[in-house]
Regions:
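Structural signal for the C-terminal ends of transmembrane alpha-helices
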Residues: 1-2, 263
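Metal-dependent amide/peptide-bond hydrolase catalytic core
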Residues: 88-264
Length: 264
């Protein structure tokens, strides 16, 4: 790109801490986006999303959140459980209550318990404390807001019904993708021009991506995020994941073509 950028300023952002959801907010706080009009990102895709050698113009990431539920009951000897409030029993019903929440079935949403911990220190003791961790996802940001409200209500009301104290905390939220259609089409055209029409794949879904914090912090920012098929298998984040490095230049070519057209 040296010598090709003749209009404006090009920033190459190598953002840390994406997995902890702290990287993008740190970039925002540092003022990196203050003078930015367009933000374009990319990520390799697993074989299930995009075939090797193909590129999708938009990765439709969902909103994601981690919700921590703490249940406080009353300990008792297991021979006299009626004298206590068994927080494992409460946890089972809390998980069931969350699973019983129904949102629009035509949309994308899910909540699943990924951790549960309770240990009174003995096998014959009713535990007075239990914690649950939920992984929560939704296809749209307003849907996520409603989902979290319903989850909070389900947890708290279940606790009251069983005479336990339940607190719900969702400290971090990764927003869903909100793209600008005209910019996505420009990315699609760059894919056609560099990789060929036959290698433009349909949009794919995805996990969470804190790139979308940029748009949430600066709504006027035009954003797009494409996915490069590199044959990643068995999937992203798998400890035994492998992918074909020969396809990485496909993503580079899209970036270069887009920047040259936009700023050359």
């Amino acid at each position: 790109l040296v010598g090709r950028v003749r209009r404006g300023t090009l920033k190459l952002l190598f953002q840390p801490a994406e997995e902890t959801l702290k990287g993008a907010p740190a970039m925002i706080q540092a003022g990196v986006l203050d003078d930015v009009e367009y933000a374009v990102g990319a990520h390799i895709r697993p074989i299930q999303d995009v075939p090797a050698g193909k590129i999708c113009a938009a990765v439709r990431h969902t909103a994601s959140a981690t919700t921590f539920v703490t249940i406080k009951g009353r300990g008792a000897h297991a021979a006299r459980p009626h004298l206590g409030v068994n927080t494992i029993d409460v946890a089972c019903r809390v998980i069931g209550a969350v699973q019983d929440i129904w949102l629009n079935p035509t949309e994308v949403w899910s909540a699943k318990a990924t951790q549960i911990h309770a240990n009174a220190g003995a096998t014959n003791t009713v535990p007075d404390t239990c914690t649950i961790t939920f992984d929560v996802r939704a296809g749209r940001n307003p849907l996520m807001k409603e989902y979290l409200r319903r989850i909070n209500l389900a947890c708290e009301m279940t606790g009251k019904a069983m005479e336990a104290e339940v607190t719900v905390d969702t400290p971090e939220l990764c927003p869903a993708a909100e793209y600008d259609d005209d910019l996505v089409e420009e990315i699609a055209q760059s894919i056609r021009d560099t990789a060929g029409v036959e290698n433009l794949a349909k949009d794919c879904g995805g996990g969470g991506e804190d790139f979308h914090c940029f748009k949430m912090a600066k709504p006027e920012l035009k954003a797009a995020y494409f996915g490069v098929g590199v044959g990643a298998t068995p999937g992203l984040h798998a400890p035994n994941m492998t992918f074909d490095e020969q396809y990485l230049p496909l993503g580079v070519n899209v970036f270069v073509d887009f920047v040259t057209k936009k700023m050359g």
